[in-house]
Amino acid sequence: MSNYEGDRHLVPLYPSPLAPGKCPVCESDDVQVNGTVFPGIHVMANVHCNQCGSDLLQDHPVGFALDYPMAINTKTKALVKAEKKLDWIHKPLITNYSAPSNDPVKVERKVHKEHRRVVILNTLDFLYGHVLLKLYNAAHYLERYPDLGLIVIVPRMFEWLVPKGTAEVWSVGLRLGQMHGWYPALDAFVQERLERYDEVYLGRGYAHPEFATIDIERFTGVQPFPLQEFDERPPHITFVAREDRLWFATRPGKFIYRALGRLGPLKGLRRWFVGKQDRMIKRSMRAILERIPEAKFTVVGLAIPGGYGTMAEDLRTRNMNDSVEMAWVNAYAQSQVVVGVHGSNMLLPTAHAAGCVEILPDDRFGNIVQDISVRWHDRMQVFMYRFVDEFAPPRTVARHVTAMFSEFNNYHRNNRLNGFANER
């Protein structure tokens, strides 16, 4: 018997796979698992129900399938009890299962340390933030299960972020936009490897893992901004300015921008709103300089660079590579504060900076903090992570930034140094 029997953070896969749950057709527990398929994002058990006779592909409880498990009847080629509100998951799944890709998939296996007992963390996803959040889980498996070798399945563009200590990296040569596909070639690669291990588990790949205990330097090789040096280092603020997720001045402006996107030939007019965002960022910088004349600024993001002159170091680009990623990460790590619109673009900035001011759209209230790599357990969270309305004017953003600098010493002393919290 494994010493991890019943461990809720591990899903037994080989040699004795755990059934994902009851039969979704008849609710019977009398099910038999006849293997597992790894076609891409989903990891699915090949299940036969001894009660109703259904043959199914049923999601193992990893990633988003932990909360939203899907099942496919392999006889009828149809989803089982699919909820319409979850069509963002089941529609791509059944579409690609019905038309699997025959394209070869290049998977590069890099072995750092051989292990006979392993846990596989599948981070494949079609969204940048989803991949990164799944990858954050690696830290917990490395720390909690030192006798299990960690294998990370990762899109090639994320390979630079795989943390030190990982036993194996299976780097998949697919773009994020291709990750929805059903790839027999990828499954064949995994199947060929599985039987070479004595014991295999799946890592849960939680969608929103605890971050405050994670050592981000293990992932990026860059030490994050040390909180105790907040008011000792030169003031530095980094703005994250994407062209595809804008800071709008008004609600009518946002409506017009979206309407232009549907009008084909008029899409070019949307560039005006990108320029408007730059003007708002520069107004924020000027307002910050009124209170903190020595402040320095960096601008990053997927965008065409230019327009900031000597006001800020402009690291924006549309051509991403590992060198650009590292330049951005170093900018975050030198920053007391990062400022940006809600989105996955805030995960690495907040993992390295001391704090942030986030512009939060109304339709993302339910996702608040999901894009923030929260570094602090205590009341410093409230002080260091600030959220403003999506139409907040530049001076409002600037007031939050300058208040973080002017009030840090007093707040930090009263809420962390003068008390018992720092002894935990």
Question: Language-model segments: what does each one mean?
Answer:
Residues R156-F158, G301-G306, H342-M346:
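Short, polar loop motifs at secondary-structure junctions
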Residues R116-N122, P234-P265, V300-L302:
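Short loop/turn segments at strand-loop or loop-helix junctions that form parts
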Residues L161-T166, P305-D314, L348-H352:
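Short loop/helix-cap segments at secondary-structure boundaries that form the rim of catalytic
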